């Protein structure tokens, strides 16, 4: 048994095996590995892109929330301003109405005072005429009575 011939035979068999593997086995394995690497790279890129999109979306959402808060504050400020304007208007109208009612009350009081004063003058005049009739002892006719009362009222 020649060790060299066996070694050469094994070397040839191994070389054929390597050539066979290089030709038929290795390319599909490399292809599968490259596909897997591409899939992993795509998945990582997609994950990174999704992460960036999520960050952008969060920033946009935060911006929208900030805008909404500002808009809500503007609406609240406008409503407060409008409320104050309405309150001022209502208070001014109430003050005008109060003044009108007070003036009307004063006018009514003055009118009532004049009416009572006139009534009192007529009663005083009637009493004066009645007293004068008792003193004189005779009654004057009604027309003369009215003339005397009118003159007394005018003097009072």
From Swiss-Prot:
Molecular function as annotated in GO: proton-transporting ATP synthase activity, rotational mechanism; proton-transporting ATPase activity, rotational mechanism
The UniProt record lists the keyword Hydrolase: no
Membrane topology: Single-pass membrane protein
UniProt GO cellular component terms: plasma membrane; proton-transporting ATP synthase complex
Pfam family, one: ATP-synt_B
Top-level division of the source organism's lineage: Bacteria
Task performed by this protein: F(1)F(0) ATP synthase produces ATP from ADP in the presence of a proton or sodium gradient. F-type ATPases consist of two structural domains, F(1) containing the extramembraneous catalytic core and F(0) containing the membrane proton channel, linked together by a central stalk and a peripheral stalk. During catalysis, ATP synthesis in the catalytic domain of F(1) is coupled via a rotary mechanism of the central stalk subunits to proton translocation. Component of the F(0) channel, it forms part of the peripheral stalk, linking F(1) to F(0).
Assembly with partners or alone: F-type ATPases have 2 components, F(1) - the catalytic core - and F(0) - the membrane proton channel. F(1) has five subunits: alpha(3), beta(3), gamma(1), delta(1), epsilon(1). F(0) has three main subunits: a(1), b(2) and c(10-14). The alpha and beta chains form an alternating ring which encloses part of the gamma chain. F(1) is attached to F(0) by a central stalk formed by the gamma and epsilon chains, while a peripheral stalk is formed by the delta and b chains.
Listed name of the protein: ATP synthase subunit b
Native source organism of the sequence: Actinobacillus pleuropneumoniae serotype 5b (strain L20)
């Amino acid at each position: 048994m020649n060790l060299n011939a066996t070694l050469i035979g094994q070397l040839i068999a191994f070389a054929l095996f390597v050539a066979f593997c290089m030709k038929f086995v290795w390319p599909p394995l490399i292809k599968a590995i490259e596909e897997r690497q591409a899939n992993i790279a795509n998945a990582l890129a997609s994950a990174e892109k999704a992460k960036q999109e999520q960050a952008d979306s969060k920033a946009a959402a935060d911006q929208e929330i900030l805008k909404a808060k500002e808009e809500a504050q503007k609406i609240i400020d406008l409503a407060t301003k409008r409320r104050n304007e309405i309150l001022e208007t209502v208070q001014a109208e109430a003050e005008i109405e109060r003044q009108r009612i007070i003036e009307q009350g004063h006018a009514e009081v003055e009118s009532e005072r004049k009416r009572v004063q006139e009534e009192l003058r007529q009663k005083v005049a009637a009493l004066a005429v009645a007293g004068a009739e008792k003193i004189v002892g005779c009654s004057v006719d009604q027309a003369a009575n009215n003339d005397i009362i009118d003159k007394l009222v005018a003097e009072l």
